[in-house]
Regions:
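Eukaryotic intrinsically disordered, low-complexity regulatory linkers and tails enriched in Ser/Thr/Pro
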Residues: 1-99
Length: 99
């Protein structure tokens, strides 16, 4: 693993499942929230553009820190390298739902 860990955070927001990558995750001083800093997005290395990742970049443009409610988070993983972030629609009858 790299010296600075990379975290993959999956959370549920407004009927969609978000998957983001970040360098720092903390328990926030705001009760019930997780603080996520230094969001990572893939570099544009060619002609292929992932519309889901572009939507994610646009939504978090200019954001240095995000506070996510603990009850919305479905999973946090420490990963070896950054992947592609995404926003997907939560399917009806899925195991993922809000509390």
């Amino acid at each position: 693993m790299s010296k600075t860990p990379i975290y993959k955070v999956s959370f549920f927001n407004q009927g969609q499942i978000y998957e983001i990558y970040a360098r720092h995750i903390y328990q926030s001083d705001l009760y019930g929230f997780i603080e996520v800093e230094e969001l990572l997005f893939g570099e544009r290395s060619g002609m292929l553009v992932d519309p889901s990742e572009e939507k994610l970049k646009a939504e978090f443009e200019g954001v240095s820190r995000s506070y996510i409610p603990m009850h919305s988070i479905t999973r946090i993983d420490e990963v070896a390298k950054e992947g592609v972030g995404s926003i997907t629609e939560a399917k009806a009858g899925s195991n993922v739902s809000t509390y």
